[in-house]
């Protein structure tokens, strides 16, 4: 619509990241370059994923409007590389668990925000046509910040050598859930033909529940033993 | 103060976490109501006439448009694009919009014009010349309705109608939920087309006999006219005239191929262009024939010129003359034959002669025969209309369904029979008045008429659109050269210094309707986002509380 509208969307998308960085104490650790490194790792991982997908998953030429469940499932499985990447970032940083998790998640999510949402916002939200999808996209970026924090925490817990055996199962289940979250959401939206706002709300709720369970596990793991 | 606010927030967090989490998003979600976001709609619009004739400007003078849409019900129309539907269109509303200095007018035509009630058709036909008679500074466009355009119209109508009657809160809510539309045309500003050629086609059948045989010219202009050039299909005016002209060419070419029926008259067929612009094509044709060449058929011995105009409907026929024919002339003989044939063979047709003197003070000539009468050639026009002022001749609603093929065939027969009786002098040879010549092998072919009509009305034939290489003209030439000899084109170009007619381009454009929101909506959204960011700031700031809460909850079972 106007530059003002772009400003609105931009603020909605980026300020929560800024706030999180400033208030979580990351800025006091001088963690900026570490976050940038995490972002660079994100880029590498995405490149590898794309190469892999392009090589082994030819474009599906099915009927228009149909949903390729198996293909999408396989693609979601490739997202395993994200978990590896997060682990890589965390293993190269020394420090407390929370610090490692925050650096990895912030770098990762910010890199995603810059790479995948900056351009559409710049092109779309400034156009004449008004569309709610840019506001939705900005809200979605906030959700994905929470999502990556939870995933980073889960990866950290899973890779700990001193993880008690009775924690192993819930952590693995949660990891699997968050990895296939996007795929499951897509299926759900497709089957129940949901509007974009309902889908967004559902995504927020699911991410909230996942991160809350993750936080509970984390808290009891850190302070439990 | 911030601490106090923080405390309140802490308490809220302590009460239940999911509640606060769910408060953030729905706060934004509720303010922005769940509307389906649609892409911009793109549709074709046809601009109103834009031309100068004899130094006078007509129609809309502008083609660029970039304004927000409204309907006439809105309070303020200035610099807005006013949408109107043909079904509830009236000249008063149109004038009201222009008086309030509207930025543009878009008139939405129904997709199926044939289904329009007769009174609306009549009303619009009366309005059309009035719209064109005045010069309009803002662009006026016509669009054909489709589902999306109708939905845009209805949303705009709802938004326009609710203005000024609601409270401030309602207005605020309205800005968030309602859609505005920004109408944008993609084309450039209209400019005069230089060196436009108006083309006419001539063909002839030479009579049998000596050098200076009398000539009968049969003339019909092929171009159409309406409030928007791209919508002018001109079925009755003057597709019907051209159809009859071509059928007469076919019939007489058959008569002229046999020596026994080869008459002593030259027949000159002329499909003129620019007929709706004061008969420019005819004017040039006459100048070429009378002033420039040494000998031509029109110079020596012209029996009469028969103009065909608007003959596809109704049970009346009128012979328009500018001077009543004198007794003993061929003109008079033709009139007598017409009367006799109609009274003896087609009693359902009402026939009359209409006498109207040429008014040189008027801007345009009334009928095509006046062009010839000015040059002292005996001429008349046959038409089913009683007056040249009828809106019927200049309407975009003059479509294929306005022409009845039965009537067209009957009129062709009447004219053909009368012409034949004059050419072969049958009355003086004591042929009976109900002698039917064009029957059996020689009969008027309805399929042929229908096909020609279909072809003519298959495309808009406004003078601005038929350029000299257009398929319409080449097909017309091809058709005429099948039956006639010496078929050739005549071109008219307006004088550079003092042009008699000037056409303008950008008559068809693509218009985009962009969904937009008012500026106040952006402010409202900015407030909501600021509130949300404030909330997330507190949430992050006090994350420790959540942490402790979870710690307490998850430890309790173990202590028991």
Swiss-Prot record, chain A:
One of its GO terms (molecular function) is ribosome binding. Residues 59-68, 127-131, 190-196 are lumenal. The chain crosses the membrane at residues 1-21, 35-58, 69-90, 101-126, 132-157, 167-189, 197-218. It is found in: Endoplasmic reticulum membrane; Cell membrane. Residues 22-34, 91-100, 158-166, 219-225 are cytoplasmic. One of its GO terms (cellular component) is endoplasmic reticulum membrane. Keywords: Cell membrane, Endoplasmic reticulum, Membrane, Transmembrane, Transmembrane helix. Its main location: endoplasmic reticulum. The keyword Cell wall biogenesis/degradation does not apply. InterPro entries: TMEM147. GO terms for biological process: multi-pass transmembrane protein insertion into ER membrane; protein localization to nuclear inner membrane. It is a multi-pass membrane protein. Belongs to the TMEM147 family. Component of the multi-pass translocon (MPT) complex. Component of the multi-pass translocon (MPT) complex that mediates insertion of multi-pass membrane proteins into the lipid bilayer of membranes. The MPT complex takes over after the SEC61 complex: following membrane insertion of the first few transmembrane segments of proteins by the SEC61 complex, the MPT complex occludes the lateral gate of the SEC61 complex to promote insertion of subsequent transmembrane regions. PANTHER family: BOS COMPLEX SUBUNIT TMEM147, SMALL SEVEN TRANSMEMBRANE DOMAIN-CONTAINING PROTEIN. This is BOS complex subunit TMEM147. The gene is tmem147.
């Amino acid at each position: 619509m106007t530059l003002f509208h772009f400003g609105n969307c931009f603020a909605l998308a980026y300020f929560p990241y800024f706030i999180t960085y400033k208030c979580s104490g990351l800025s006091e650790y001088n963690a900026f370059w570490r976050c940038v490194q995490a972002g660079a790792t994100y880029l590498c991982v995405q490149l590898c994923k794309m190469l892999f997908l392009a090589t082994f998953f030819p474009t599906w030429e099915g009927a228009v409007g149909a949903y390729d469940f198996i293909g999408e499932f396989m693609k979601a499985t490739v997202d395993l590389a994200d978990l590896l990447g997060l682990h890589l970032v965390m293993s190269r940083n020394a420090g407390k668990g929370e610090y490692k998790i925050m650096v990895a998640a912030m770098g990762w999510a910010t890199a995603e925000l810059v790479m995948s949402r900056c351009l559409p916002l710049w092109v779309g939200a400034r156009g004449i046509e008004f569309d709610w999808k840019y506001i939705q996209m900005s809200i979605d970026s906030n959700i994905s910040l929470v999502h990556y924090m939870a995933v980073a925490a889960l990866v950290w817990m899973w890779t700990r050598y001193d993880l008690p055996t009775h924690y192993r199962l819930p952590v693995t289940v949660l990891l699997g859930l968050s990895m296939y979250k996007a795929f499951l959401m897509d299926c759900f939206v497709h089957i129940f033909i949901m509007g974009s706002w309902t889908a967004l709300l559902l995504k927020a709720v699911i991410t909230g529940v996942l991160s809350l369970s993750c936080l509970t596990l984390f808290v009891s793991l850190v302070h439990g033993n | 103060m911030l601490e106090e606010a923080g405390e309140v927030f802490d308490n809220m967090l302590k009460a239940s976490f999911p509640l606060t989490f769910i408060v953030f998003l729905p706060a934004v979600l509720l303010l922005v109501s769940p509307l389906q976001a649609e892409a911009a709609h793109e549709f074709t619009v046809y601009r109103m006439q834009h031309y100068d004739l004899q130094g006078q400007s007509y129609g809309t003078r502008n083609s660029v448009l970039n304004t927000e849409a409204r309907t006439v019900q809105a309070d303020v129309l200035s610099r807005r694009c006013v949408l109107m539907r043909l079904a509830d269109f009236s000249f008063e509303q149109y004038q009201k919009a222009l008086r309030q200095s509207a930025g543009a007018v878009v008139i939405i035509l129904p997709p199926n014009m044939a289904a329009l009630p007769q009174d609306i058709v009549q009303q619009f036909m009366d309005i059309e010349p009035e719209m064109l008679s005045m010069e309009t500074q803002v662009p006026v466009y016509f669009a054909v309705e489709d589902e999306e355009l109708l939905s845009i119209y209805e949303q705009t109508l709802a938004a326009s109608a609710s203005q000024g009657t609601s409270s401030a809160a309602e207005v605020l809510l309205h800005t968030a939920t309602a859609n505005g539309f920004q109408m944008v045309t993609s084309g450039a500003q209209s400019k005069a087309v230089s060196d436009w050629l108006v083309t006419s086609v001539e063909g002839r059948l030479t009579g049998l006999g000596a050098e200076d045989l009398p000539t009968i010219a049969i003339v019909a202009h092929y171009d159409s006219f309406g409030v928007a050039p791209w919508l002018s299909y001109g079925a009755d005016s003057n597709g019907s005239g051209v159809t009859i002209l071509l059928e007469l060419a076919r019939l007489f070419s058959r008569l002229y191929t046999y020596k026994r029926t080869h008459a002593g008259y030259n027949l000159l067929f002329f499909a003129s262009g620019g007929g709706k612009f004061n008969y420019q094509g005819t004017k040039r044709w006459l100048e070429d024939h009378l002033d420039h060449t040494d000998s031509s058929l029109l110079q020596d011995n012209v029996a009469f010129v028969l103009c065909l105009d608007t003959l596809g409907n109704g049970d009346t026929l009128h012979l328009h003359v500018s001077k009543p024919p004198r007794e003993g002339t061929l003109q008079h003989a033709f009139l007598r034959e017409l009367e006799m044939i109609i009274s003896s063979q087609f009693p359902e047709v009402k026939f009359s002669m209409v006498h109207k003197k040429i008014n040189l003070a008027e801007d345009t000539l009334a009928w095509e025969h006046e062009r010839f009468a000015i040059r002292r050639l005996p001429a008349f026009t046959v038409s089913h209309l009683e007056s040249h002022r009828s809106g019927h001749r200049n309407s975009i609603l003059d479509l294929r369904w306005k022409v009845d093929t039965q009537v067209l065939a009957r009129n062709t027969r009447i004219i053909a029979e009368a012409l034949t009786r004059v050419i072969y002098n049958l009355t003086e040879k004591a042929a009976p008045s109900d002698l039917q010549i064009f029957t059996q092998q020689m009969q008027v072919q309805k399929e042929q008429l229908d096909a020609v009509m279909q072809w003519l009305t298959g495309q808009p034939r406004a003078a601005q659109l038929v350029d000299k290489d257009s398929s319409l003209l080449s097909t017309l030439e091809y058709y005429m050269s099948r039956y006639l000899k010496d078929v050739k084109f005549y071109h008219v170009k307006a004088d550079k210094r003092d042009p008699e007619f000037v056409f303008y381009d950008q008559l068809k454009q693509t218009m985009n309707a962009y969904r937009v929101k008012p500026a106040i909506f952006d402010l409202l959204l900015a407030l909501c986002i600021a509130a949300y960011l404030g909330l997330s700031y507190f949430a992050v700031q006090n994350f420790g509380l959540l942490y402790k809460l979870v710690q307490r909850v998850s430890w309790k079972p173990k202590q028991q």
